[in-house]
Amino acid sequence: MQGFSKKVQDVNNYSKVKGDLFIRLLNKKKHEKALENAVYKEVDGIACVLYMKVGQRDGCISSMKIHKASLADWGMDEDEAYENALANTYFLTPPRIYKWECLLFNPNYEGDDFMDMNYEENIVERNAGSCLSTSIRTNGAVAVFLPNVAQRIADLMDDDFYIVFTSVHEAMIHPKRIHWL
């Protein structure tokens, strides 16, 4: 991977950075000042922000927000850049459903690829609920905003659902028709 400073210098060259663009969530109200020049879409107070990965080491990612000024250099509008980064996020860190009890007792548990059309497990009947994240379990709360994810969860549950953002790394999924609440 290119060095940090080289990546930052290339930020205005879309062809060089497009594979490193992804979406990360921030609380819009809490990060209002930092979002002034950033590229993002708001969903109910959550800012889905365009970032660029500038480095990675020992499983940790260094990144920077993309500013609106970069879009002019890229020759694209916010919607196009956002949609491209959203798709890229999906492929870089695919969404996964984790059985809560497996997460607690098995550190090597990799979750279920519920987006696979052959996946048919009932995610409603889990006593502890289902945890939505990504394949790397980092910044996984973004998974619900990835293409077709919310619809797939609703289809698997055969119901609407509640989502509880427990951190930026995951969200708990519960069917609307929970009987034990």
Descriptions of predicted regions:
Residues 126, 133-181:
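C-terminal structured domains
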Residues 1-124, 128:
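Extended, low-hydrophobicity segments enriched in charged/polar residues
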